[in-house]
Amino acid sequence: QAEELGRKLAEEQPGIDEILYSPLVRAAETARHISEMTGIPMRMEPRLKEQNFGRFESTPRNGEEFMEAKSHFLDHYDGGETMMHLCQRVYNLLDDVKAESDHKTYLLVAHNGISRIVQSYFYDMTNEEFAHFGIKNCEIREYYF
C-alpha cells in the first residue's frame, strides 16, 4: 500500500514539500517508502504518535469494554493518555504547522486515531462522528488552513 501510494504521488506530483511522520514503525516505514519513491524530504514528528491506550494496548479496538472506555474523553485508560491530552498534542502540532508553513504542503503519515483528531481540528464533529471516524491505510485526505 505504501509503495502504491508512493508511485501515485511520484506520478501526480501534488506539490508536497515535506513528510511529517509518526515515530511508530509502520508509519515510519510508510513515510520512508513514499520519500524514497518521490524524493520528498521527511521529518519524524513525535506528536503524531498514536494515543497511549494504557491497559488497552494491543487489544481489539472494537471490543465492548474498549468502545465504552473510548467514550470517556477525560479518562487515562489505566495508565494511558486521555483523549483530551491527545487532542492537545495534535492541535498544538497543527497550530505549529500552520504558523511555520508559509504556504508549504505537508503529508502527515500517522495513525487512525490521529486522523480523527486532525478531522476534528478542521471540521465540527458530534461525539458519535468522532468516535466512529476512520480512514483506510494509506488514504489521503486534504485539509487547508
Give residue spans per PLM region.
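Generic structural signal for well-ordered alpha-helical scaffold segments
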Residues: 3-10, 87, 91-99
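Catalytic metal-binding/acid-base residues of hydrolase active sites
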Residues: 25, 48-49, 113
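Phosphate-handling substructures
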Residues: 35-91, 144
